[in-house]
């Protein structure tokens, strides 16, 4: 790979890349027809009148469950909503402690305080950036009700050990798979190892309808509870109603709220699901090429837990070389890479004990008394691995992995060029 000697693009030099990159989302050939069918159907929501045919929402739920070889799928309005459904369906509530990783998207924690429970942040594994089982074990108390394991960026967490810890202590294990659609561990899809697996279908995700989510489970009781929780306390009838009547029935079993997706979203998701494996395979192939190129010049790509049989690349992540960039300002590095490549390169998520997006004290709804406020104060947690690593990680969105080998070489060339100019990137 030729080394660049020109000035950095951020310093008025010539960028490595001038061509456009692949965009995301990418609609399938059948998406417009699927949306048109919903538009003409007379039913745009699950609360709309039954028209004698399977709804788009039920069709997607059935196919997503089949994809995971699991019995039940409950679609929802977002990944956040799906995680809240899972927590409440599993009985997590006021005063319960929920262990989750110190580095993840803020919703993994905000959903916990949203059900009046207490997030407990545990540190991460330095290789996978996922929840460290030893840190989880150390964080368990008599108040621990659940563990939320997040499969972060492009890694699968250590499900063998985390499931063993959860089972041994009688704690519910919930998988947050918002960034891991289609990933596999020991030949099984993620989301099928815990009591519930939750997914996000937001714009940036590898399976998307702009906004949306889903929860999967093998447990019919949990599935029925989640149906009630997402549809204002209603669930599907056992038998189809007469045409023109609503499929949902009021049972009085469990109060819920409206967290449903529309028929339009479900139609898009069904189309996208048919392309998920193809896109995932392309990203995986290109990520493996890039791993080799970046490793050659000293970067350290994110790893996945041994036993991972299929990775899903939501975000590509690499750690800066210690020798060449020991004291680099991560913001300067990501700005330099962005200027070279023409797409956003960003630092990793800030640890949740110091993340400006996670501030329960800014919401009066969480002011439930001095003791509760003390428990949900994120500053009480010490996360040394999270703090150290997030100052050394660069990340970019999976859309760039939808190109070809020459695109991966452009990315590697930009990363190499930045190394050449390390003196100007020091903190």
From Swiss-Prot:
Modification N6-(pyridoxal phosphate)lysine occurs at: 205
EC number: 2.6.1.100, 2.6.1.101
Region listing for Disordered, in residue ranges: 1-20
GO MF annotations, alphabetized: pyridoxal phosphate binding; transaminase activity
A single GO BP: polysaccharide biosynthetic process
Cofactor: pyridoxal 5'-phosphate
Keyword RNA-binding attached: no
Coiled coil: none
Reaction catalyzed: 2-deoxy-L-scyllo-inosose + L-glutamine = 2-deoxy-scyllo-inosamine + 2-oxoglutaramate; 3-amino-2,3-dideoxy-scyllo-inosose + L-glutamine = 2-deoxystreptamine + 2-oxoglutaramate
Pathway(s) the chain acts in: Metabolic intermediate biosynthesis; 2-deoxystreptamine biosynthesis; 2-deoxystreptamine from D-glucose 6-phosphate: step 2/4; Antibiotic biosynthesis; kanamycin biosynthesis
Top EC class, one word: transferase
Assigned keywords, A-Z: Aminotransferase, Antibiotic biosynthesis, Pyridoxal phosphate, Transferase
Primary role: Catalyzes the PLP-dependent transamination of 2-deoxy-scyllo-inosose (2-DOI) to form 2-deoxy-scyllo-inosamine (2-DOIA) using L-glutamine as the amino donor. Also catalyzes the transamination of 3-amino-2,3-dideoxy-scyllo-inosose (keto-2-DOIA) into 2-deoxystreptamine (2-DOS).
Family per record: Belongs to the DegT/DnrJ/EryC1 family. L-glutamine:2-deoxy-scyllo-inosose/scyllo-inosose aminotransferase subfamily.
PANTHER family (alphabetical): DTDP-4-AMINO-4,6-DIDEOXYGALACTOSE TRANSAMINASE, TRANSAMINASE
Protein name: L-glutamine:2-deoxy-scyllo-inosose aminotransferase
Protein's organism: Streptomyces kanamyceticus
Organism classification: Bacteria, Bacillati, Actinomycetota, Actinomycetes, Kitasatosporales
